[in-house]
Amino acid sequence: MKSTVEKLSPTRVRINVEVPFAELEPDFSKAYKELAQQVRLPGFRPGKAPAKLLEARVGRAAVLEQVVNAALPARYSEAVTASDVKPLGQPEIEVTKIEDGQELTFTAEVDVRPEIELPDLSGVAVTVKPVTVEDSEVEAELDALRARFGTLKGVERAAENGDFVSIDLSATVDGKEVEEAATTGLSHEIGSGQLIDGLDEAIIGLKAGEEKVFTTKLAAGEFAGQEAEVTVKVGSIKERELPDADDDFAQLASEFDTIGELKDSLTEQVKGRKRIAQADEIRDETITALLDKIEIPVPEKILEEQIGNNLHEAVHGLDHNEERLNELLQEQGSSREEFDKDMRESATKSIKTELLLDVIADKFDINVDQQDLTERLVLMSRQYGIEPQQLVQYLTQQQQLPGLYVDVRRGKAIAEVIRQAKVTDSTGADVDVDAVLGPRRGGADEAGAEAEAAEEKPAKAKKSADSEKTDKSEKAEKKSKKKSKDDDAE
């Protein structure tokens, strides 16, 4: 077999392949065996009919067609391997000549990874936000925790932001009742924004037993996107009372003995989330810095496929109704033209990033082993709240394991670049890249992965093993006493 490569553009080639018929003998043998099972000839058992009789029955052209169709994929793969091109997507194959007994020739046009020349990676410099925790952020975390242990108390006043109300709802569109919008005794936290637009504003100021009519656009159902007159009636109003932020609360709501220890733990949790955000920023800024230095042509066919996939995802929640998408964009002060432009720019950057990271992975000869994949699968299973084996089963069924391999390899590639780059925060301080990336080996060796894994671990008090049982006993006793005092108060 002979093959040559024509470069049609920086991202597309035509591979010309010539296959002597002598090399197709195994394909002919296979074709005759398959035909022998399919075609019944008098006097011969299934699978035993001679090739000449089979050919006489179905015709030489049918045999050739079967041989060629079976031979093309393998011969194309051989030609790709011999040419050292890196295809992107499926080829467009055209048989140009079948000279029976002599030669088969075909061409395969395919998008390929362009040649990308990497700059000196040690010259890459990025600046990111520092990891700092404000007292107000810790207080917000503490308030959120207190809210989980709060109690609701009925009030005899107008509803305010943050109150919990029981409401009845009904709606009409052009005088027609919207049945799916009618409900009674619905519990709602004012200010949560979890229900329809305009509801919170309508409720605030109402007392129990009062109602109000307001106009809003329905987001779902038969009348989605249409203006509706909504009537809301308040049944009851309750406010949430928060427990005092003291040592008793710390013991009730956590494994800590003092409010100071609890605040320290909350501080570390906030810091952990900010480290994840910083890691993501380092990754994004590093990629942007590289893309600014390198010209990367994008295959047009691959780009159009990516845009099509992104659009499919965008309208999936709208029952694939692009008119509804256009209406939503208009409501947001945007337009379909701006949306399409942003989508094209986003898809272009995404493809350039993937091409770039693949080249970097090749440069550093990055491999992905079983431990790499296991680490990533464990991390993903924590995020999704399922067992790793369930995740593996799902990815296998969806044929997404090869994609996972590629993602891990690209993650390790950007980690190598970050290690060579100069990373500082906006205060001018150097960022500890090793703390961001974690250990060099492993699939979690990606910006943010180590910090993300750490975020999953619950904060724990640093106590010695010898005192652990005593601490638990004392804490149980304190909680018991606190509960008794609360019961007496009631």
Swiss-Prot record:
What Pfam family is a match for this entry?
Trigger_N
Look at the named UniProt entry and state the broad enzyme category this protein falls under.
isomerase
Q: Name one GO cellular component term.
A: cytoplasm
UniProt-listed InterPro entries: PPIase_dom_sf (IPR046357), PPIase_FKBP_dom (IPR001179), Trig_fac (IPR005215), Trigger_fac_C (IPR008880), Trigger_fac_C_sf (IPR037041), Trigger_fac_ribosome-bd_bac (IPR008881), Trigger_fac_ribosome-bd_sf (IPR036611), Trigger_fact/SurA_dom_sf (IPR027304)
Per UniProt, the keywords (alphabetical) are: Cell cycle, Cell division, Chaperone, Cytoplasm, Isomerase, Rotamase
Biased composition of type Basic and acidic residues is found at 454-477
SUPFAM superfamilies found in the cross-reference section:
FKBP-like, Triger factor/SurA peptide-binding domain-like, Trigger factor ribosome-binding domain
Output the Gene Ontology terms for molecular function. peptidyl-prolyl cis-trans isomerase activity; protein folding chaperone; ribosome binding
Q: Could you tell me which residues belong to the region Disordered?
A: 433-490
Query: Known HAMAP family for this protein?
Result: Trigger_factor_Tig (MF_00303)
The record describes the protein's role as: Involved in protein export. Acts as a chaperone by maintaining the newly synthesized protein in an open conformation. Functions as a peptidyl-prolyl cis-trans isomerase.
- Domains as described in the record: Consists of 3 domains; the N-terminus binds the ribosome, the middle domain has PPIase activity, while the C-terminus has intrinsic chaperone activity on its own.
Name this protein carries in UniProt: Trigger factor
Instruction: Name the source organism.
Output: Mycobacteroides abscessus (strain ATCC 19977 / DSM 44196 / CCUG 20993 / CIP 104536 / JCM 13569 / NCTC 13031 / TMC 1543 / L948)
Gene encoding this polypeptide? tig
